[in-house]
Amino acid sequence: MNTRDKIITHALNISCEIYNANKNNIISNNNRSSSTIKAKRMFIYYLYEYMEIKHTGMKKYIKDINHASSIHHVNKFHFELQTYEDVKKYFNTFLTEMKKFNVYGGGFYEKRKEIKKLLNELNKIKND
């Protein structure tokens, strides 16, 4: 298992812990209970927004999910994150746990943020 897969597996485990959901129900995509949907929604949002996995790539992690369902979950979670305090609190807990898991040693999120900043600067210079 490579580092990226370890991070993704940990993200799935943390989202399941937060919502008390069964990991296999999320992966197999065959359960519509509230806790499963909430955990799956958070997991998909994280994969899309933080791991930069495209909607069409979600099927690698969740069986038989199509890109439209992935888009729906990301948009719905984004709305809930902006609207509901409890979702915001749970997601902050999730992010804190993910940062603790830091398998890159020097801070994956910080490095990613720095790379994006440098890419933006390069694009700005290129366009000027």
Q: What does each of the following model-derived ranges do?
A:
Residues 48, 73-81:
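DNA major-groove recognition helix of helix-turn-helix
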Residues 54-73:
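Short, basic interhelical loop/turn and adjoining N-cap
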